[in-house]
Amino acid sequence: MVTGGMASKWDQKGMDIAYEEAALGYKEGGVPIGGCLINNKDGSVLGRGHNMRFQKGSATLHGEISTLENCGRLEGKVYKDTTLYTTLSPCDMCTGAIIMYGIPRCVVGENVNFKSKGEKYLQTRGHEVVVVDDERCKKIMKQFIDERPQDWFEDIGE
């Protein structure tokens, strides 16, 4: 796992979009976790999204899942040259989606407020994981957890 810095020319763009999505979700009254899927070849944004569990009464619309949903239908081969950006370490469900679609690279904004087993599992399956330790991501997530601990525990299945 790479920690601390941006490694690709699209990483800052991807993390900025993911954070914008997290902030939008928070403003809507949801969990502030955002994501973005970027094509590694040309930097095009294939999809972006944020956690919509509270807004839509959904059990599964985490930030990463919402991002993939907003990509629409893509050929399987498209995912093979992408990076998924997420503001928070992916949970088991989101890790499974990353593996299922063969997304080779995942850039994580922060893993202080939630440290899942997903990062390590992705690595064992051959996926690159980069944790950039983004202060914006840490701050908005901590603020949400402090304000709404029960909603946070519900979101992570506790």
Swiss-Prot record:
Q: Which SUPFAM superfamilies match?
A: Cytidine deaminase-like
Amino acids binding substrate: 51, 155
Classification via InterPro entries:
APOBEC/CMP_deaminase_Zn-bd, CMP_dCMP_dom, Cytidine_deaminase-like
Catalytic residues of the enzyme: 64
Q: Does the keyword Flavoprotein apply?
A: no
Give the record's biotechnology entry.
Also catalyzes the conversion of 5-fluorocytosine (5FC) to 5-fluorouracil (5FU); this activity allows the formation of a cytotoxic chemotherapeutic agent from a non-cytotoxic precursor. yCD/5FC is one of the most widely used enzyme/prodrug combinations for gene-directed enzyme prodrug therapy (GDEPT) for the treatment of cancers. 5FU is an anticancer drug used to treat breast, colon, rectal, stomach, and pancreatic cancers, and is the drug of choice for treating colorectal carcinoma. However, the drug has high gastrointestinal and hematological toxicities.
Reaction catalysis annotation? cytosine + H2O + H(+) = uracil + NH4(+)
Could you say which enzyme class this protein belongs to?
Answer: hydrolase
Function, in words: Catalyzes the hydrolytic deamination of cytosine to uracil or 5-methylcytosine to thymine. Is involved in the pyrimidine salvage pathway, which allows the cell to utilize cytosine for pyrimidine nucleotide synthesis.
Kindly give any further remark recorded in the entry: Present with 5180 molecules/cell in log phase SD medium.
**What is the name attached to this protein's record?**
Cytosine deaminase
| Organism field | Saccharomyces cerevisiae (strain ATCC 204508 / S288c)
